[in-house]
Amino acid sequence: MTTTPPSVFGNVRLGYIVIETNKFADWRRFGQDAIGMHYDDTLPDVTRFRLDDNECRFLLQRGPAEDVTALGWRLDDHDTFDEILSRVTRHGVPVTEGTAEEAALRGVERLVRFPGPNGLAQEIFTRAHTSSTAPSRRHRAGDDARDASNLKCYCRTY
């Protein structure tokens, strides 16, 4: 008799993305000035953006990839966390515990990482830290972009 594993549908949401880049100034113009995200650059090789009370939604780390290097998935509860972890390990996918420093940079209590089908790191967590300060409203989306000519400094043609 086969047992159907519990459904995790509706219990998983995108929590954050991790991007490796050396173009911090371009990202700041895009994230803060064009989109209106709150900008946090407290560490020299790390920048974080957020749109809400969560400490981090976009984590930029200095490096040559110029690409997304990880997706962070917020799970609604520990049962969902345990179920996904069980499924991944049952299929032989290697799992590693994130460090306390990595969790702090992402604004989460704890994370577990495993590779996705194309090698992109998938990170799961259950609790995101919320910021004690409201997102900066200084650069709301559209404030500088009402005149379409201002968008040229935010978006490049490739």
Predicted features along the sequence, with ranges:
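A short, polar/proline- and glycine-enriched secondary-structure boundary/capping micro-motif
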Residues: 38, 70-72, 133-136
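Conserved short beta-strand elements that form part of the metal-binding/catalytic scaffold
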Residues: 36-69, 77, 120-128
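Vicinal oxygen chelate
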Residues: 2-7, 13-22, 63-151, ...
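Residue-level signal for secondary-structure boundary sites
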Residues: 25, 57, 79-81, 132
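Core segments of cupin and vicinal oxygen chelate
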Residues: 9-56, 110, 158
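Non-heme Fe(II)-dependent double-stranded beta-helix
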Residues: 52-54, 74-75, 106, 143-145
